[in-house]
Amino acid sequence: MSLRFLLGRSGSGKTTACLEEIRRQLQEDPKGRTIVYLVPEQMTFQCEYALIHTEGTEGMIRAQVFSFPRLAWRVLQETGGMNRYHVHDVGVQMMIRKIIEQRKQELKLFGRAADKSGFVEQLHEMIAECKRYCLTPDELRRHAGVLESGSGQPGRRLLADKLSDVALVYEELERSLLGHYLDSEDYLRLLVEHIPRSSYLHGADIYIDGFHHFSPQEYMVIEQLLHRCRRVTVCLTADRPYDVGMPDELDLFYLPAQTYRQLRELALANDIMIESPVVLSVNRRHQDKALAHLEEQFHRRPLLPYEAETDAICLYEAANRRAEIEAVAREIIRLVRDEGARYRDIALIIRQTEAYRDLVKTVFFDFDIPYFMDEKEPMHYHPLIELVRAALETVVTRWRYEAVFRAVKTDLLFPVDGDLAMWREAADKLENYVLAHGVKGEKWTSDERWTYRRYQALDGLNVPQTDEERQFEDKLNEWREALAAPLRRLERRLRRAADGRGLCTALYLFLEELQIPKKLEQMSAQAEADGRLVEARQHEQAWNAVVDLLDQYVEMLGAEPLPLAEFAKIIEAGLDRLEFALVPPAIDQVIVAQLDRSRLIDVKYAFIIGVNDGVIPAKVKDEGLVAEVEREQLRELGVALAPGGREQLFYDPFFVYLALACPSRRLYVTYPLADGEGKALMPSPLIKQLVQLFPRVSVHLCGNDPFDAPEEKPETFVTVPRATQTYLISQLRAWKRNYGIDPLWWDVYNVLISHPEWRARVEQAVSGLFYTNQAVLKREWSRRLYGKKIQASVSRMEQFQKCPYAHFASHGLRLKERNVFRLEAPDVGQLFHAAIKQIADRVREQHLDWKQLSRSECERLSAEAVERIAPLIQQQVLSSSNRYEYMKRKLKNVVARTTHVLSEHARASGFAPVGFELSFGPGGDLPPLRFQLRDGTVMELVGRIDRVDKAESSQGVLLRIIDYKSSAKTLDLTEVYYGLALQMFTYLDIVLTYAEQLVGEPALPAGVLYFHIHNPIIQAKQWLDNEMEVARKLLEPFRMRGLLLADAETIRLMDSQTENGQWSLIVPAQLTRTGAIHSRSSVASASDFAALRQHVRRLFVDIGGQIADGVVSIAPYKLKNKTACEFCAFKPVCQFDEALSGNGYRKLTPQTKDAVIETLGKREEES
């Protein structure tokens, strides 16, 4: 029995020496004593591959490559001990959660933290660390007692309480697992116990390689191996034996020196012979002198510069991380294509895997680079995991929309042999219905049939259901039953379950009834047929993982009664920790490795990426239950735990050294100057160190495309078709903007366009350069869309003027937004309009007078109107919750306040309403306005006028238009001029054109006014002394805005209290003390009103002609800071982009009121 050290710096050939010695023994005696090559988990495949591909070796029966856990599994298989149930981390955490719940009252600190996210995982990691470092619960209690008795040092009591709580949970966990279960940390303890009984290891030769330090458990295993085996050879990356004297903590080899000393002391304590250390002093790896110089001089002070030219060390500075990875990918392609490298010769070494993981996957896919990432992928996004999570959330949250449709969108609720496309469309329609009707809770689970009505007008209570609506309703209920029935059965079983076993059984039956194994098998077969082999294997893994999770729960908590919400929380925590098994690397792949974790063999080209400040050297992270300061306190007590932040800071140069010394031919060190959000990043101090060490090596700037990297030759961007196409399009875009490009890119274009596989892709990409995002609708298609007679509302005409494409999307394609079950501004506006109409009807029916309405009558009429209308708004949304009931009360107050103000207006006004919600169009109260368009198409304007008032004056009958608005609105003649606001003058034109039909005689225009329906808070700078001031303050916010006839008599008719030079509280006008109209009044002459009416008519004819001609241009207006795109629902459809040729705003010039009236007046004179 002996211990032998094989020492040497990185690249000295330690691994090669071990492998050659093993090969030699295999060749001499293939069936001799056991040879075990013990390496870290991530190194096992490479070592097995190296052994298998040994020339002259007929087999390797006697030699096997193991990691510590796999060696434990092999020995326990031989000696017994595998009969206990293996509990994964998820199962252990379930047990910890149960212990905390049961012993909460005894816990000093953790009882309050138990429900916090991630706490159980942290506690489990702490207990696992205690096991690895052979700390028992009793020892933890003893150390807690020492800390508690000590004084004068801050935080000792807190740490004592932590240790006490950890000890309590740890002890209870061990008691629960004892004799029945094994967790991941128990295998090495069992291995220690069973090595003495293992005939497999008796007299074996053990080679331990790839480790730099060991945990106490691993030291105990090595101790037993020293007793049982013939020889244990330990390879360490160290410059010399450390039999006498330890290096300084800042020494590069401090970590392996510690390991050397501990192993030596272990052998001496057990009377094991220590052979003379074998020190390999020659650098066998580095074929280039510069790399050898780097390995030798790194971390030496002072630095000895390497003055010769070299291409073995390359420094890349990139604009951002994507540019960095693309530059690396281009260089990998060049190495393989031009220098004969194999992908397996290349390694990507990363410390910040979370920042680069997805980027590497995306870029390497674009460049067709095969790679193996030494990192397990979480199962979060697998459909089965999402189904289980969403199904439990559906039950716990009582069928919330989001949870239900997360389950539906996994596709796993659909029938196993159903048409997937058909069921997805059905699910979309079902989702639209649920969103529009606010379906949740009992609406899903009751037997009550869902009803469907496409339209539900506020005054159309008895409209019969159409055959089309009835057919859709039948389909809707059929889809609902098919998708909701499995979830309903799951809910019933879960709520009947008496314990954890019952809950897991309910969930398993749910998955079985849905035939999940068969569906996943189909998905796997499809993925395999499409060449997605990794995905094909993942489907089976996901099913096994979920079933195993349920098994673990039953084993750990099966007999425990548990609230459903707590069960769902535990299962979700378990699902979050599920990971796909690592797929073994293929023969020829780039290895993507983590700087601190991976062990690499036979790498010729290494790329160390993301070398920024804060990454190398690494920042100390104070994570876990025990803080860095507390670890220091424990270390003072002699407690051995995993290296804390301080030690890791000392060890960091060693791991950087290993990465730098890894390649045998060329080293690339890269760093970005900005992250994905554009925030600046600083290069690591390592970059400065390398520049000082190699002064002849310059930093190479990498850009996103050839224009960003003038140093690079254009041909370096020509790699594989997919990636090259991206650069080609970038160059052609520059050429289109009259920039010069290298002739090489035309050759690239010709090659790609001549290739059958890439021709269509290139043509599609190139077409985008000349894409104008505009289209013309032929006149015949316009006729088919809109018909020979166009019936249009005024708002439709306005929409066309704002943007012709928005009109086409809305009225041609008939696109509309999803209807969502919530109260929105248009719904409030509808309610206000309908309420005022119904109040006016009740005033007329009950023979009341607007002028005589009291405040209480206004409140009564308003409350009754809102109560009648509310059930017809958005599927009774105002009755769906306490919040909406409160909003309904607020709306009643608004309507009551408005009604009272209207009553006050009536008292002061000579105008009286002659119509509310007056319709015009075929079958309406008034005929439509008709226009003959230039192609013979007839256009009719239809709509509804909120209110028309009439008054008698010395000149004759006066008519005015009042439009109710739920938000403040002013009449801007600029918008009228450009056709953006046509309603008011169209309504005025309608009532004046058909005045004889409406009031029995011709009429004159009195004005157009907006009335703001609201319930404002009265603000005053000082105390209001009398009722008159209060009344004035109450009426001021309700002053109507608009345009009035410039006639003093008309203004007095609108407000009899406008004398004495005061502003009217009703209309936007003021009379001076002499009775003249004040210049600030918003007025226009009768001829001006006529000119505005004629202008609006001309606009309608022009708009109608353009619609008939098929104008669908994407031409949104821009007026000051307002644009048509601001609130447009069709932005995702039109894809308006000012950067595209032909896309731009129609910029409208603001006009003053006088300028508009003058322009229109001149036009009238000319006509």
Curated annotation (Swiss-Prot):
Its cofactor is Mg(2+); [4Fe-4S] cluster. [4Fe-4S] cluster binds at residues 803, 1125, 1128, 1134. Its EC number is 3.1.-.-. Binds 1 [4Fe-4S] cluster. It comes from the Bacteria. Residues 282-588 form the UvrD-like helicase C-terminal domain. Transmembrane segments: none annotated. One of its GO terms (biological process) is double-strand break repair via homologous recombination. PANTHER family: RECBCD ENZYME SUBUNIT RECC (PTHR30591:SF1). HAMAP family: AddB_type1. Belongs to the helicase family. AddB/RexB type 1 subfamily. The heterodimer acts as both an ATP-dependent DNA helicase and an ATP-dependent, dual-direction single-stranded exonuclease. Recognizes the chi site generating a DNA molecule suitable for the initiation of homologous recombination. The AddB subunit has 5' -> 3' nuclease activity but not helicase activity. This is ATP-dependent helicase/deoxyribonuclease subunit B. It comes from Geobacillus thermodenitrificans (strain NG80-2). The lineage of its organism: Bacteria, Bacillati, Bacillota, Bacilli, Bacillales. The gene is addB.
